[in-house]
Protein backbone atom coordinates (compact mmCIF):
# COMPACT_ATOMS: atom_id res chain seq x y z
CA UNK A 1 0.00 0.00 0.00
CA UNK A 2 1.38 3.40 -1.01
CA UNK A 3 1.41 6.18 1.64
CA UNK A 4 -1.53 8.03 0.09
CA UNK A 5 -3.38 4.87 -0.96
CA UNK A 6 -2.60 5.46 -4.63
CA UNK A 7 -2.43 2.67 -7.19
CA UNK A 8 0.95 1.93 -8.76
CA UNK A 9 0.19 3.90 -11.93
CA UNK A 10 -1.56 6.85 -10.26
CA UNK A 11 -0.02 10.32 -10.13
CA UNK A 12 -0.69 12.64 -7.22
CA UNK A 13 -3.36 15.34 -7.66
CA UNK A 14 -1.85 17.92 -10.04
CA UNK A 15 -2.94 21.56 -9.83
CA UNK A 16 -1.74 24.36 -12.14
CA UNK A 17 -2.66 27.88 -11.03
CA UNK A 18 -1.93 30.34 -13.85
CA UNK A 19 -1.16 34.07 -13.50
CA UNK A 20 0.04 33.44 -9.96
CA UNK A 21 2.22 36.56 -9.96
CA UNK A 22 1.49 39.78 -11.83
CA UNK A 23 4.83 40.87 -13.31
CA UNK A 24 6.08 37.85 -15.28
CA UNK A 25 4.80 37.19 -18.80
CA UNK A 26 3.89 33.70 -17.61
CA UNK A 27 3.56 32.46 -14.03
CA UNK A 28 2.24 29.20 -12.64
CA UNK A 29 2.09 27.62 -9.22
CA UNK A 30 2.31 23.90 -9.88
CA UNK A 31 1.36 21.38 -7.20
CA UNK A 32 2.04 17.65 -7.34
CA UNK A 33 0.45 16.62 -4.07
CA UNK A 34 2.48 18.39 -1.39
CA UNK A 35 5.25 19.44 -3.78
CA UNK A 36 4.74 23.06 -4.78
CA UNK A 37 6.85 25.02 -7.27
CA UNK A 38 6.46 28.59 -8.53
CA UNK A 39 7.37 28.74 -12.23
CA UNK A 40 7.74 32.05 -14.08
CA UNK A 41 8.58 32.81 -17.71
CA UNK A 42 10.32 36.11 -18.50
CA UNK A 43 10.82 37.45 -22.02
CA UNK A 44 13.81 39.52 -23.12
CA UNK A 45 14.58 40.84 -26.57
CA UNK A 46 17.90 39.53 -27.86
CA UNK A 47 19.76 36.26 -27.56
CA UNK A 48 23.07 35.06 -26.09
CA UNK A 49 26.19 36.04 -28.00
CA UNK A 50 26.66 32.59 -29.52
CA UNK A 51 23.24 32.90 -31.25
CA UNK A 52 23.41 36.51 -32.47
CA UNK A 53 22.56 36.95 -36.13
CA UNK A 54 21.23 33.40 -36.52
CA UNK A 55 17.57 34.41 -36.41
CA UNK A 56 16.56 32.05 -33.66
CA UNK A 57 15.58 32.35 -30.02
CA UNK A 58 16.74 30.72 -26.83
CA UNK A 59 15.16 29.20 -23.73
CA UNK A 60 17.08 28.90 -20.50
CA UNK A 61 16.15 28.04 -16.92
CA UNK A 62 17.11 28.60 -13.31
CA UNK A 63 16.07 26.41 -10.38
CA UNK A 64 16.23 26.89 -6.65
CA UNK A 65 14.69 25.81 -3.37
CA UNK A 66 13.47 28.11 -0.63
CA UNK A 67 15.43 27.49 2.58
CA UNK A 68 12.53 25.80 4.37
CA UNK A 69 11.11 23.90 1.39
CA UNK A 70 12.41 20.75 3.08
CA UNK A 71 12.16 19.18 6.55
CA UNK A 72 15.18 21.10 7.81
CA UNK A 73 16.43 24.49 6.69
CA UNK A 74 18.96 24.60 3.85
CA UNK A 75 21.04 27.75 3.48
CA UNK A 76 20.45 29.72 0.30
CA UNK A 77 23.03 28.94 -2.36
CA UNK A 78 23.64 32.67 -2.77
CA UNK A 79 24.84 32.74 0.84
CA UNK A 80 27.26 29.91 0.04
CA UNK A 81 28.62 31.83 -2.94
CA UNK A 82 28.02 29.12 -5.54
CA UNK A 83 25.39 26.82 -6.96
CA UNK A 84 25.50 23.14 -6.12
CA UNK A 85 25.92 20.44 -8.73
CA UNK A 86 22.34 19.22 -8.23
CA UNK A 87 20.96 22.70 -8.91
CA UNK A 88 22.97 23.11 -12.11
CA UNK A 89 21.95 19.65 -13.32
CA UNK A 90 18.25 20.32 -12.72
CA UNK A 91 18.14 23.74 -14.35
CA UNK A 92 19.89 22.40 -17.44
CA UNK A 93 17.36 19.58 -17.57
CA UNK A 94 14.46 22.06 -17.36
CA UNK A 95 15.93 24.19 -20.16
CA UNK A 96 16.57 21.19 -22.44
CA UNK A 97 13.06 19.91 -21.86
CA UNK A 98 11.38 23.20 -22.67
CA UNK A 99 13.50 23.89 -25.75
CA UNK A 100 11.98 20.69 -27.14
CA UNK A 101 8.53 22.31 -26.86
CA UNK A 102 9.37 25.31 -29.05
CA UNK A 103 10.45 26.00 -32.63
CA UNK A 104 13.38 28.29 -31.84
CA UNK A 105 13.54 29.64 -35.41
CA UNK A 106 9.91 30.76 -35.22
CA UNK A 107 10.60 32.31 -31.81
CA UNK A 108 13.07 34.70 -33.41
CA UNK A 109 15.62 36.64 -31.42
CA UNK A 110 13.93 36.48 -28.03
CA UNK A 111 15.25 34.83 -24.88
CA UNK A 112 12.80 33.29 -22.43
CA UNK A 113 14.06 32.51 -18.94
CA UNK A 114 12.14 30.00 -16.86
CA UNK A 115 12.60 30.42 -13.11
CA UNK A 116 11.49 27.49 -10.98
CA UNK A 117 11.47 28.09 -7.23
CA UNK A 118 10.51 25.20 -4.97
CA UNK A 119 8.20 26.42 -2.20
CA UNK A 120 7.66 22.98 -0.67
CA UNK A 121 9.39 19.72 -1.54
CA UNK A 122 7.85 16.27 -1.22
CA UNK A 123 9.53 14.44 -4.09
CA UNK A 124 9.53 15.14 -7.81
CA UNK A 125 10.56 18.81 -7.72
CA UNK A 126 12.31 18.67 -11.10
CA UNK A 127 9.42 16.93 -12.82
CA UNK A 128 6.93 19.37 -11.30
CA UNK A 129 9.16 22.26 -12.42
CA UNK A 130 9.17 21.07 -16.04
CA UNK A 131 5.40 20.55 -16.01
CA UNK A 132 4.62 23.97 -14.52
CA UNK A 133 7.25 25.82 -16.55
CA UNK A 134 5.74 24.49 -19.77
CA UNK A 135 2.40 26.12 -18.95
CA UNK A 136 4.13 29.38 -17.95
CA UNK A 137 6.04 29.24 -21.24
CA UNK A 138 2.82 28.73 -23.20
CA UNK A 139 1.30 31.82 -21.56
CA UNK A 140 4.40 33.90 -22.33
CA UNK A 141 4.40 32.84 -25.99
CA UNK A 142 0.69 33.61 -26.29
CA UNK A 143 1.45 37.14 -25.06
CA UNK A 144 4.16 37.59 -27.69
CA UNK A 145 1.61 36.72 -30.37
CA UNK A 146 -1.16 38.83 -28.81
CA UNK A 147 1.19 41.83 -28.63
CA UNK A 148 2.06 41.50 -32.30
CA UNK A 149 5.71 40.67 -31.66
CA UNK A 150 5.31 37.24 -33.27
CA UNK A 151 3.07 36.31 -36.18
CA UNK A 152 3.10 32.58 -35.47
CA UNK A 153 3.11 30.87 -32.11
CA UNK A 154 6.32 28.79 -31.90
CA UNK A 155 4.91 26.31 -29.36
CA UNK A 156 5.07 22.82 -30.88
CA UNK A 157 3.16 21.08 -28.09
CA UNK A 158 3.15 20.40 -24.40
CA UNK A 159 6.02 18.81 -22.53
CA UNK A 160 5.62 17.16 -19.12
CA UNK A 161 7.61 14.99 -16.76
CA UNK A 162 7.08 12.45 -14.02
CA UNK A 163 9.16 10.30 -11.72
CA UNK A 164 8.89 6.52 -11.69
CA UNK A 165 10.70 3.96 -9.60
CA UNK A 166 10.84 0.56 -7.99
CA UNK A 167 9.98 0.48 -4.29
CA UNK A 168 9.82 -2.83 -2.39
CA UNK A 169 9.99 -4.63 -5.72
CA UNK A 170 7.01 -2.78 -7.21
CA UNK A 171 7.15 -0.32 -10.13
CA UNK A 172 5.28 2.88 -9.22
CA UNK A 173 4.60 6.29 -10.76
CA UNK A 174 5.14 9.78 -9.28
CA UNK A 175 7.11 9.08 -6.12
CA UNK A 176 6.61 11.21 -3.05
CA UNK A 177 9.52 11.78 -0.68
CA UNK A 178 9.09 8.71 1.55
CA UNK A 179 8.92 6.50 -1.56
CA UNK A 180 11.82 8.23 -3.29
CA UNK A 181 14.06 7.83 -0.24
CA UNK A 182 13.33 4.08 -0.14
CA UNK A 183 13.48 3.40 -3.89
CA UNK A 184 15.67 0.65 -5.30
CA UNK A 185 15.42 2.37 -8.68
CA UNK A 186 14.66 6.04 -9.24
CA UNK A 187 13.94 7.50 -12.67
CA UNK A 188 12.79 10.83 -14.12
CA UNK A 189 11.16 10.81 -17.55
CA UNK A 190 10.38 13.80 -19.77
CA UNK A 191 8.11 13.37 -22.80
CA UNK A 192 6.27 15.33 -25.44
CA UNK A 193 2.49 15.25 -25.43
CA UNK A 194 2.52 12.52 -28.09
CA UNK A 195 4.74 10.26 -25.99
CA UNK A 196 8.15 10.88 -27.55
CA UNK A 197 11.02 10.80 -25.08
CA UNK A 198 13.04 13.94 -24.40
CA UNK A 199 15.08 12.67 -21.47
CA UNK A 200 15.37 9.67 -19.17
CA UNK A 201 17.41 9.89 -15.96
CA UNK A 202 17.51 6.53 -14.23
CA UNK A 203 19.64 5.14 -11.42
CA UNK A 204 19.69 1.86 -9.54
CA UNK A 205 20.03 3.00 -5.95
CA UNK A 206 20.15 -0.57 -4.66
CA UNK A 207 19.42 -3.57 -6.86
CA UNK A 208 20.16 -3.10 -10.60
CA UNK A 209 17.04 -3.16 -12.78
CA UNK A 210 16.38 -5.36 -15.79
CA UNK A 211 15.54 -4.41 -19.36
CA UNK A 212 11.97 -5.59 -18.76
CA UNK A 213 11.70 -3.41 -15.65
CA UNK A 214 12.99 -0.43 -17.66
CA UNK A 215 10.23 -0.93 -20.23
CA UNK A 216 7.66 -1.24 -17.43
CA UNK A 217 8.86 2.03 -15.89
CA UNK A 218 8.74 3.84 -19.24
CA UNK A 219 5.19 2.59 -19.82
CA UNK A 220 4.19 3.81 -16.36
CA UNK A 221 5.78 7.19 -17.11
CA UNK A 222 3.95 7.50 -20.41
CA UNK A 223 0.61 6.83 -18.76
CA UNK A 224 1.34 9.35 -16.01
CA UNK A 225 2.49 11.98 -18.48
CA UNK A 226 -0.66 11.54 -20.59
CA UNK A 227 -2.69 12.37 -17.48
CA UNK A 228 -0.47 15.35 -16.64
CA UNK A 229 -0.66 16.74 -20.20
CA UNK A 230 -4.45 16.58 -20.03
CA UNK A 231 -4.26 18.68 -16.85
CA UNK A 232 -1.91 21.16 -18.56
CA UNK A 233 -4.27 21.58 -21.50
CA UNK A 234 -7.29 21.99 -19.24
CA UNK A 235 -5.45 24.69 -17.27
CA UNK A 236 -4.61 26.60 -20.46
CA UNK A 237 -8.26 26.54 -21.54
CA UNK A 238 -9.46 28.22 -18.33
Swiss-Prot record:
GO BP of this protein: rRNA catabolic process; rRNA processing; tRNA processing
Gene3D superfamilies noted in UniProt: GHMP Kinase, N-terminal domain
EC main group: transferase
Alphabetical list of PROSITE patterns matching this protein: RIBONUCLEASE_PH
GO molecular function terms listed in the Swiss-Prot or TrEMBL record: 3'-5'-RNA exonuclease activity; tRNA binding; tRNA nucleotidyltransferase activity
Disulfide bond found in the keyword field: no
Catalytic activity from the UniProt record: tRNA(n+1) + phosphate = tRNA(n) + a ribonucleoside 5'-diphosphate
Keywords of this entry: Nucleotidyltransferase, RNA-binding, rRNA processing, Transferase, tRNA processing, tRNA-binding
Function statement: Phosphorolytic 3'-5' exoribonuclease that plays an important role in tRNA 3'-end maturation. Removes nucleotide residues following the 3'-CCA terminus of tRNAs; can also add nucleotides to the ends of RNA molecules by using nucleoside diphosphates as substrates, but this may not be physiologically important. Probably plays a role in initiation of 16S rRNA degradation (leading to ribosome degradation) during starvation.
Family: Belongs to the RNase PH family.
Protein name: Ribonuclease PH
Amino acid sequence: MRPAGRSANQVRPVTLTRNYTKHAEGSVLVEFGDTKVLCTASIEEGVPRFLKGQGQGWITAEYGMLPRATHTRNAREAAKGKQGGRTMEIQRLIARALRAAVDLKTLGEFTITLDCDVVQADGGTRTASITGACVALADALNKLVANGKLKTNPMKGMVAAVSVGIVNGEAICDLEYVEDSAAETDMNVVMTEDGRIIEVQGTAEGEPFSHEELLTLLALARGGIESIVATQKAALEN
